[in-house]
Swiss-Prot record:
Region (Disordered): 94-118
Gene of this entry: rpsM
Record protein name field: Small ribosomal subunit protein uS13
Protein family per UniProt: Belongs to the universal ribosomal protein uS13 family.
GO molecular function: rRNA binding; structural constituent of ribosome; tRNA binding
Length: 118
């Protein structure tokens, strides 16, 4: 198994699919990485040379991935909450942030139903 950005990449899958195992790298980003390095997206990781894997590693290092990306996302949410803006308040209360209805739906975000106390 090749190790890129601190993640074990599966050997028996295509390069494009294997790169998506890295948090922050989707199909489109994986295809652009393959194009930038000149690696065949349909080639399996086990068939690549060490030089090609190093090229992939260097290209992935240019992108914010894994822990840094998670930290950045959490800092953005924390910033909204500290500002006290509408989106920050919705995050703080655990409600949907992007304008979805909450009268009947939003059970995932709100959690299980709470019984009405009399």
């Amino acid at each position: 198994m090749a190790r890129i950005a601190g993640v074990n990449i599966p050997d028996n899958k295509h390069t494009v699919i294997s790169l998506t195992y890295i948090y922050g790298v989707g199909r489109t980003t994986a295809q652009s990485i393959c194009a930038a390095t000149g690696v065949n997206p349909a080639a399996k990781i086990k068939d690549l040379s060490d030089e090609q894997i190093d090229q992939l590693r260097n290209e992935v290092a240019k992108i914010t991935t894994e822990g840094d990306l998670r930290r950045e996302i959490n800092m953005n949410i924390k910033r909204l909450m500290d500002l006290g803006c509408y989106r920050g308040l919705r995050h703080r209360r655990g409600l949907p942030v992007r304008g979805q209805r909450t009268k009947t739906n939003a059970r995932t975000r709100k959690g299980p139903r709470k019984p009405i106390r009399k």
